[in-house]
């Protein structure tokens, strides 16, 4: 199975069903008028969870097993809290 890579501009959010922080990060990005691609990872996790987590680890440069998994311009940001901090810093002006 091929996994969808993060987009080169804007945000990419890897999420899953029944994930409250996945919903919160989508709301947060919308509130800050940021464009984002949301990828529901339910099928990835069912088909091959280990391979998906390896894919994320390779992209992120470190292990990250919790959702959401957020990238900005294909660079790993982290989860909800990290994304919130980045948005506050970016929009501080």
Feature-to-residue mapping (PLM):
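Local sequence-structure signature of Cys/Sec-based thiol-disulfide redox active-site neighborhoods
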Residues: 1-39
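Structured loop/turn residues at secondary-structure junctions
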Residues: 16-17, 44, 75
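Alpha-helical interaction elements in eukaryotic regulators
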Residues: 18-21, 48, 52, 79, ...
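Thioredoxin-like thiol-disulfide oxidoreductase module
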Residues: 41-65
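Non-catalytic, surface beta->alpha helical segment in thiol-disulfide oxidoreductase systems
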Residues: 72-93
């Amino acid at each position: 199975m091929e996994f969808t890579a993060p987009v080169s501009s804007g945000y990419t959010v890897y999420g899953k069903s029944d994930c409250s922080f996945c919903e919160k990060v989508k709301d947060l990005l919308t509130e800050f008028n940021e464009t984002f691609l949301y990828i529901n990872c339910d099928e990835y996790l069912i088909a091959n969870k280990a391979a998906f987590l390896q894919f994320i680890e390779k992209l992120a440069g470190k292990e990250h097993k919790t959702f959401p998994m957020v990238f900005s311009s294909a660079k790993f940001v982290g989860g909800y809290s990290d994304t919130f901090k980045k948005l506050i810093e970016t929009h501080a002006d």
